[in-house]
Amino acid sequence: MRLVLLGAPGSGKGTQGEKLVAHFGIPKISTGDALRAAVKARTPLGLHAKAAMDAGDLVANEVVYGIVEERLGQPDAQKGFILDGFPRNLAQAQVLDGMLERLGAKGVGKALHLHVSDEEIVRRLLDRAQKEGRADDTEPVIRHRIDVYNAETSPLLDYYGKQGKLVKVEGVGSLDEIFQRIVDVLK
């Protein structure tokens, strides 16, 4: 299974992604985790990333792409993977397709979109901000994050939809109900 996990901030994709890891026994790969692992392992790309981060700069896209490709090429990802947080836009999806082709994979198997209404996301994130004492997560900031996500992700949903790879799951309900919906559509 080669799965791209899509969902707005607060949609529950992180939680459901962990449940999928346990259920299917394949790794969940996030760009942040892959970046930290490459830096820790002191790979050539990891050293480039570390230099940028130490200077307070953004890590160049090409370095991020290389690190993701390195991670996808590791033995534990050969039988499948769950990508969380990548791709974020159409250009990254096209880069991902090239990576998978170079690695001998047949591309993304499914793109799972965990759909939650904007109002529910606002409610969840405000609740989380209050519980975690995150004063910077105000409603206007949250709505802006949702708008940015929607603008970036809409073409991505179309891209995977046209390929017949997009599956949408309603992300409201108990954790177990949502997970069962996900497992059902991935069968």
Model-derived segments and their meaning:
Residues 1-187:
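Glycine-rich phosphate-binding loop of ATP-dependent small-molecule kinases
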